[in-house]
């Protein structure tokens, strides 16, 4: 009995410590959840939601193409000034990188959030009050919404500045649509101190209040090519006196289709698409040369390198067989190939956990791999990153998805997604800094 009593006495302090630790952990979890709830509630406040809609609509009315985002950049800077957030400008010609340093004066980790700003050369066919006023230009890929969401995150984060356990950089990036703006942002060194990066893209197939992503390869690597086959022009009535580049180009185009069909593992995604052919213009003239081009895509950078190698070999080989000259330009400087978006396992898990606390388990889904390309891949290749999609659909837009996909002149979004995007951005950043501050 004495021994038992002594053991019990020794256990009491241990039990008290354990009880305290459990209570502290529970309180911390409650505080984190409450903070996430506060973020979403703050983003959905009528004044905030109205401001977000106004920002998005102003950008939507005046879309600007890659590296032409002058007016959009001015709007971003004006809003950051009003919020009280400092920034660097110009970055990559028209970009803006804002910085919100936490209460520690910049001590701690640095995390970055990104939004793209450019529009597409598309004539808007949506008839609404805030329709594009720029002929032949439209925000048909939701970059106006991306920019508004990130400005919303800036407001939410600035109000919680003293609670941040590090620094948040907000990247308002130019030229995502084909011009590799992310590459040029990185070249300027403004993100050299960033330890992790997060980004999102609107998805009209998902309802408002839902985000989606997957670990590992998410969006494809992509590139473009222009093939030129040169023969000997002549009269179409005397083909034996000419060297016909049309036949050589036709054979090359057909042979290119065999790469994916017969050389790529069916379980590995790959695409080679020929999207244009240009030859002669007369019915009775065999042209001197033929040009054709298109895009190639893969889920890995190694896969893209293989496609490029085989495209070159096939074009040159078919040209030679048909007594022509042939060459391929992959435009690696003027239209830089995009690397695959590969989500870091840890950053994916982090973003998923933050989104689940904010939106609930039903608000986060596993996304399929996408053959679409995103220059966020440049960031993901440089630092641990995660990229996810955010729902902007509703019963009306989702039922007509075929007519409302991104890059469509009929593309629309449900603006109720704007506060959700702002809150998700802010939650991911706050949680990352809180989690990693102790390791600095």
From Swiss-Prot:
Functionally, this protein is described as follows: Hydrolyzes certain amino acid conjugates of the plant growth regulator indole-3-acetic acid (IAA).
SUPFAM superfamilies in UniProt: Bacterial exopeptidase dimerisation domain, Zn-dependent exopeptidases
* Family statement: Belongs to the peptidase M20 family.
Name of the protein in question:
IAA-amino acid hydrolase ILR1-like 9
**Gene Ontology MF terms:** IAA-Ala conjugate hydrolase activity
The EC category is hydrolase
What Gene Ontology terms for biological process does this UniProt record contain? auxin metabolic process
Report the EC code(s) recorded for this entry. 3.5.1.-
Disulfide connectivity for this sequence is: none
Q: Is Hydrolase one of the keywords UniProt gives this record?
A: yes
Species the sequence originates in: Oryza sativa subsp. japonica (Rice)
- InterPro entries named among the record's database cross-references: Amidohydrolase, Bact_exopeptidase_dim_dom, ILR1-like_Hyd, Peptidase_M20, Peptidase_M20_dimer
Pfam families per UniProt: M20_dimer, Peptidase_M20
Q: Which UniProt keywords apply?
A: Hydrolase, Signal
Q: Which residues form the signal peptide?
A: 1-27
């Amino acid at each position: 009995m004495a021994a038992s009593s002594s053991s019990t006495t020794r256990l009491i302090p241990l039990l008290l410590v354990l009880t305290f630790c459990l209570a502290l952990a529970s309180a911390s979890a409650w505080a984190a959840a409450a903070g996430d709830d506060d973020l979403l509630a703050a983003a959905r406040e009528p004044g905030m939601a109205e401001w977000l809609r106004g920002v998005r609509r102003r950008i939507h009315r005046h879309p600007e193409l890659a590296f032409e985002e002058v007016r959009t950049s001015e709007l971003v800077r004006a809003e950051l000034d009003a919020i009280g957030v400092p920034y660097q400008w110009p970055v990559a010609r028209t970009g803006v990188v804002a910085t919100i340093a936490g209460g520690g004066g910049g001590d701690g980790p640095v995390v970055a959030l990104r939004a793209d700003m450019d529009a597409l050369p598309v004539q808007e066919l949506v008839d609404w009050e805030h329709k594009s006023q720029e002929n032949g230009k439209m925000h048909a890929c939701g970059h106006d919404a991306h920019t508004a969401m990130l400005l919303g995150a800036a407001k939410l984060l600035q109000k919680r500045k003293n609670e941040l356990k590090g620094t948040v950089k907000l990247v308002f990036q130019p030229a995502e649509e084909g011009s590799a703006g992310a590459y040029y942002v990185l070249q300027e060194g403004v993100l050299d101190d960033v330890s992790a990066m997060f980004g999102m893209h609107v998805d009209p197939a998902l309802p408002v209040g839902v985000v989606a992503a997957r670990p590992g390869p998410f969006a494809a690597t992509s590139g473009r090519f222009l093939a030129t086959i040169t023969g000997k022009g002549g009269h179409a009535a005397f083909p034996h006196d000419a060297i016909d580049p049309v036949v050589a180009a036709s054979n090359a185009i057909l042979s290119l289709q065999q790469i994916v069909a017969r050389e790529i593992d069916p379980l590995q995604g790959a695409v080679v698409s020929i999207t244009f052919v240009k030859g002669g213009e007369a019915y009775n003239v065999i042209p001197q040369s033929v040009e054709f081009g298109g895009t190639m895509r893969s889920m890995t950078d190694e896969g893209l390198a293989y496609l490029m190698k085989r495209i070159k070999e096939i074009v040159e080989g078919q040209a030679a067989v048909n007594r022509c000259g042939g060459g391929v330009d992959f435009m690696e400087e003027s239209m830089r190939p995009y690397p695959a978006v590969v989500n870091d396992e840890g950053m994916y898990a982090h973003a998923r956990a933050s989104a689940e606390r904010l939106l609930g388990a039903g608000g986060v889904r596993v996304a399929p791999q996408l053959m679409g390309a995103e220059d966020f891949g440049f960031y993901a290749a440089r630092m641990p990153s995660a990229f996810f999609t955010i729902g902007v659909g509703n019963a009306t837009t989702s039922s007509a998805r075929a007519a409302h996909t991104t890059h469509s002149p009929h593309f629309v979004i449900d603006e109720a997604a704007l506060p959700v995007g702002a809150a998700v951005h802010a939650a991911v950043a706050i949680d990352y800094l809180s989690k990693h501050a102790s390791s600095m």
